[in-house]
Each structure stands twice: as structure tokens, then as C-alpha cells.
Amino acid sequence: MSRLLPLLGSRTARSLRPGPAAAPRLPSWCCCGRGLLALGVPGGPRLLGTHPKKEPMEALNTAQGARDFIYSLHSTERSCLLKELHRFESIAIAQEKLEALPPTPGQLRYVFFHNAIPFVGFGFLDNAIMIVAGTQIELSIGIILGISTMAAAALGNLVSDLAGLGLAGYVEALASRLGLSIPDLTPKQVDMWQTRVSTHLGKAVGVTIGCILGMFPLIFFGGSEEDEKLETTN
């Protein structure tokens, strides 16, 4: 029920938006106009139930917000709302029983790029930070403590993982600014094997490209240090 209440709220808000000189018109499909008017019109009067007039109500996508809205309705309004929710749920169940077509090649390509682009950033940052941190650890702490190159690389990987925890949100936000919205697929199409294969393939290709691009710090680290180590050992 909490899943359907936001849909009802958004539908009510659109249908109850007042014109320049006209009063808000109540929808013909429901008789509980007074309770929905208090919910749907932004800044409208909330004179029902125990909520004060200036107290903001929580969103209906939370259990507390849905409970407060239900308690603010009268018995006839609650029965009308329950009847409409049952009708909406029956329509949704009927649509789920229909056989869904597999995703088109265009949709699969969109799913591929939608999953590949963020993982390019993840792979790039992970590899670049690991190389830089591992090299600095080897040249500073490694000389003092005498740790091996593999131990320095492991510590660099630790730094890269810790940095990835904080940078993951920024990478996702940057990828969302590119205009890649969520693929328009039905729930059945999302669960199909074609979509899953395209999703995992996009992630794998994105990480591979990102890790290859993340090797660019090796350009700035010359081989003179390794040559000096070889000369000293010889």
C-alpha cells in the first residue's frame, strides 16, 4: 500500500492544480476530495485530523507519512481510498500477467552504456590511486621499514579502496549529469537474461577501460629509480 500511495498523491496533485481564476476541481474517480485536496495542493489548508495548520506533513513514501494521512481521513474517505487502491492493484496485477516482449537491441545498448560509463570512473580512480599511493609508500615507508614492493602495492590498494568508499557517490553523480536516465524497461524485461547479460557486460567493459586509463601515472614514474636499485644490488 505504501508503494501505491505516492502514485495516488502525484496523480491527485496534477489533477487538483488550480487555474488562474478557477477553484481546484476534484477528480471524478474518487469521492474523498477533501482529504486529497489537503494532500495534493501545495501549501493548501490542512485542517483535517490532528495536524495543525502550519505543521508540515511527511511524504507518503514513508510509513509514518502514510499513517498520518490515513488518520487524517474520515471513514467514508478511507473506504473510497481503499476501493481505489484495490482497483489500481488489480490493474497492475492484470498487466503483470501479460507476456512481456524481450528488450530491443536499442534498449540493450542503452543498458550496456548506462552501466559501463560509471564503472569507467570507478576503474580509473581505483587504479590511478593505487599506483600513486603504492609508489609513494614504497619510496617513503618502504625505505624506512624495508618492506617489499608487493607489500607497498598492497598498502596502495588499501588506500585506493578507502578512497573509493568516499568517491563512489561523486562518480555516480557525475555519471548522472551526463543525461543517462534509467532504462525504460518493464519489471519483467529487467529480470530477463538478455538484460542481465548486457548489464554485467557493460560493467566488465567499463571497469576494464577505466583500469587501463588509470595506468597513466606510470608515465610520470620513470625507470631511473629501478635502475639505481639494480646498480646498487649489482
Curated annotation (Swiss-Prot):
UniProt organism field: Mus musculus (Mouse)
Organs and tissues of expression: Predominantly expressed in the ventricular tissue (at protein level).
Gene knockout outcome: Knockdown leads to irregular staining patterns of perinexal proteins, altered calcium and potassium currents, impaired cardiac conduction, and intercalated disks structural defects in both cellular and histological levels. Hearts ultimately develop dilated cardiomyopathy, severe fibrosis and congestive heart failure.
Membrane topology annotation: Multi-pass membrane protein
Assembly, per entry: Monomer. Homodimer. Interacts with GJA1. Interacts weakly with DSP. Interacts with SCN1B.
Domain of life of the source: Eukaryota
Protein name per the record: Transmembrane protein 65
GO cellular component labels: intercalated disc; mitochondrial inner membrane; mitochondrion; nucleolus; plasma membrane
Record: transit peptide: 1-55
InterPro entries: TMEM65 (IPR019537)
Gene: Tmem65
Subcellular location: Cell membrane; Mitochondrion inner membrane
Function, as annotated: Essential for maintaining proper cardiac intercalated disk (ICD) structure and function as well as cardiac conduction velocity in the heart. Its association with SCN1B is required for stabilizing the perinexus in the ICD and for localization of GJA1 and SCN5A to the ICD. May regulate the function of the gap junction protein GJA1 and may contribute to the stability and proper localization of GJA1 to cardiac intercalated disk thereby regulating gap junction communication. Regulates mitochondrial respiration and mitochondrial DNA copy number maintenance.
Ranges facing Cytoplasmic side: 56-110, 160-203
Gene Ontology process terms (BP): cardiac conduction; cardiac ventricle development; regulation of cardiac conduction
Signal peptide range in chain numbering: none
Keywords annotated in UniProt: Cell membrane, Membrane, Mitochondrion, Mitochondrion inner membrane, Transit peptide, Transmembrane, Transmembrane helix
